[in-house]
Amino acid sequence: MSTITLDAPPPIETQVGGVDHFSSAAEREKQIALLPDERTLPLGPIKVVHAFWLAGMSCDGCSIAAVGATSPSVEDLIAGTIPGVPRVVLHHSVLSVESGEAFTHNYTMAEKGELGAPYVVIYEGSIADERIAAATGGYFSAMGAEKMPDGSSRPIPTATWLKRLAPGAAAVIAVGTCATWGGIPAAVGNPTGSMSIMDFLGKDYRSAYGLPVINVPGCSPVGDNFTETIACTLLFLNGHGPLPEFDELGRPQWLFDETVHQRCVRAGYYEEGTFAEAYGDKECLVEIGCWGPVVQCNITSRGAINHMGGCMNTGGVCIGCTMPGFPDRFSPFYKKPPGANISSAGSKVLGTFMRPLRKISMGYLNRETRWVKEGHVPSGWGHVENPGLVMGLIHKLYIKYQFLGSKKTWKAE
């Protein structure tokens, strides 16, 4: 396989997706300075990609969501069964068989540029300010240890691992809201100084393949959103597809361009101005604390696991967990959002007219033409009244308007 050194990147002729160059010249020089001179990137088809999973201030919920994915599954990625997608070698401190130095060996090899294959860094959880913990001789989030000059060992913060691995990574992917936006550990008043990966690496960060930080939010995220983003990114890195479309915050555009409300199974109730008054009601949940109309997330259409479940689908309200403002800007939870006072009031006014009109249409459409001619409905399940004089007149006007400008092939009695 031919190779190309990082200090002589090929010219980029056209803009691909949201990345129009590998990085700024100054940033590239800074990244190259962090890498050994012999560091190389493969050109041509990639057969294997290593995925180094790091965990910061997290609850491991993102790991659980990822292994629950089905479209594609983590097993598909590891086995290399997806056409065009290189086989993924996953290094995960919880899922791996190895432990101790045997586990961290490959991380060290990647840091030194001796891995012999491209790699991506996946970070779960927010990054705490380790200086705060170090002031008292501790640490917040660490993995592995390194020898000190005095012979002692010191834990290696995962933030340090990220700083070491990010410059040479083909891509850095933040999974979950803690990693993408800071999340709960970074909420106002936290004592850890936690921040997101994007905040930690900075605006000018670019991976070795020219990509800014990729963000797949959610607390926890939809597992399929994560694995699909991984697969699409690897297809691009392998030269089998264009760069996936990401929005201005690095989110997969095709997954986060619509709101929860636009695909919600309860959205029809909102349109008609009927709202739930208590949890367990079937109507729209906006008035009991749902932020769905202004939250970018696809869980109502994709479900939580295997296209099943999801907050609103199972009766829960949306608390905005995929958004950068979570949790502070959505607090207090389970309270009617301020904007709902206006939007739901408008829906109620419109619904006052829409609901009766739709019932009239349903009454018209719930009759066979034969039943209209014969004047009765032959149902043994209950008595169905014929429309009265006024309703009959409305139905005739409905039919006339329905076929306005069209040829009617049947006669209404």
How does the language model describe each region?
Residues S2-S301, H307-C311, P324-S331, K400, ...:
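Iron-sulfur-associated redox domains of electron-transfer enzymes in respiratory
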Residues M312-T314, I319-T322, P332-E413:
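Terminal low-complexity/disordered tails
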